[in-house]
């Protein structure tokens, strides 16, 4: 999978921009606040349908403009894909794939797979479970639209149940209808997440051993809020969720929200048996996240048959020279986009192996 071309009109600080990319490595270099990350963001937007920096589309439109437009041409193994995103300050965004309008956001997923690594990803090990759930859900959604729609359904049912608990002080019999639906969707979420962690944990462990030269052992552990066994089938999991909901009803009613279920799941990272969040050094935390990101590349390749695009936003300065070298020289099969303020770490790459774009105030040389 390769992003061949990118076109921007009135996107962030770019009034009009047309770029063609190198099939392996593309480097956006320039001082801070010049627009490097905006380029990475626009590619990500064409993959996920939303920014990784803001939930407000208005912020993506050039100041004093009403619309913005993004177009990417993606070369895949069996076909070319054209993705268009039109942002409007007065209505929701319009999405097209090969000139066909998309009705649902989920229809965009899988047309352009990306793995993003930015300084914000350290939240995976530094902050609470919501960051780790977001990681799991984002990556699974790229390879399974069924999971994406099940997650959307679960969240809608959860909102209804919480409203009943909070505003109407619903009786248990009123809640039971929602419990059945919530448990059915939730059971599938647990199955998908469990399978995902099983696969990515093996890959992340291998990546981590390569990076640390087998000195450290990384474990990625799925920790569902509802306690299930490794071999529990979806029907068994559903019954366990229902039982939890019933047992927690009085607590839920008192708090006005649902206190158990997949929306409270977590993912634990351990190095040599110790929780990285609590006991890991800054370097170990970075390496654990890097290993996860590299594992994502292999997981997507295994699921869809080709590597996703790797987006590295201002992370080279976060890694030591050994990890920088490993990252740059072990991704020859993956098209990579890097934003950086200096070329020092990339100087030993041959000119024919990369393209360099100098970014200055929304202009590119």
From Swiss-Prot:
Belongs to the RecF family. GO terms for biological process: DNA replication; DNA synthesis involved in DNA repair; double-strand break repair; SOS response. The gene is recF. The RecF protein is involved in DNA metabolism; it is required for DNA replication and normal SOS inducibility. RecF binds preferentially to single-stranded, linear DNA. It also seems to bind ATP. GO terms for molecular function: ATP binding; single-stranded DNA binding. This is DNA replication and repair protein RecF. InterPro entries: DNA-binding_RecF (IPR001238), DNA-binding_RecF_CS (IPR018078), P-loop_NTPase (IPR027417), RecF/RecN/SMC_N (IPR003395), RecF_2 (IPR042174). It is found in: Cytoplasm.
């Amino acid at each position: 999978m390769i992003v061949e071309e990118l076109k921007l009109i009135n996107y962030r600080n770019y009034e009009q921009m047309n770029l063609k990319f190198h099939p392996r490595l593309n480097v956006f270099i320039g001082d801070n606040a010049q627009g490097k990350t905006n380029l990475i963001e626009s590619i990500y937007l064409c993959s996920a349908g939303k920014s990784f920096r803001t939930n407000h589309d208005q912020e993506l439109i050039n100041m004093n403009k009403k619309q913005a437009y993004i177009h990417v041409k993606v070369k895949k193994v069996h076909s070319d894909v054209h993705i268009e995103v039109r942002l409007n300050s007065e209505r929701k965004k319009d999405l097209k794939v090969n000139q066909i309008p998309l009705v649902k956001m989920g229809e965009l997923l899988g047309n352009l797979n990306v793995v993003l690594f930015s300084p914000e990803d350290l939240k995976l090990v530094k902050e609470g479970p919501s960051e780790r759930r977001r990681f799991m859900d984002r990556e699974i959604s790229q390879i399974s639209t069924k999971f994406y729609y099940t997650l959307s359904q679960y969240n809608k049912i959860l909102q209804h149940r919480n409203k009943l608990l909070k505003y109407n002080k619903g009786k248990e019999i009123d809640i039971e209808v929602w419990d059945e639906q919530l448990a059915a969707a939730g059971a599938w979420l647990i199955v998908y997440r469990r399978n995902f962690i099983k696969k990515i944990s093996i890959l992340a462990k291998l990546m981590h051993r390569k990076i640390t030269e087998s000195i450290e052992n990384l474990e990625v552990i799925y920790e569902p809020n509802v306690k299930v066994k490794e071999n529990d089938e979806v029907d068994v999991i559903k019954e366990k969720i229902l039982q939890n909901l019933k047992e927690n009803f009085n607590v839920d009613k008192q708090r006005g929200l649902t206190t158990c279920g997949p929306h409270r799941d977590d993912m634990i990272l351990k190095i040599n048996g110790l929780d990285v969040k609590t006991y890991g050094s800054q370097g170990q935390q970075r390496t654990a996240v890097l290993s996860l990101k590299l594992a994502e590349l292999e997981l997507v390749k295994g699921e869809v048959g080709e590597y996703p695009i790797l987006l590295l936003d201002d992370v080279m300065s976060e890694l030591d020279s050994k990890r920088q070298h490993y990252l740059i020289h072990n991704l020859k099969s993956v098209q990579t986009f890097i934003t950086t303020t200096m070329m020092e770490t990339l100087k030993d790459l041959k000119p024919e192996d990369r393209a360099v774009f100098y970014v200055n105030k929304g202009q590119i040389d």
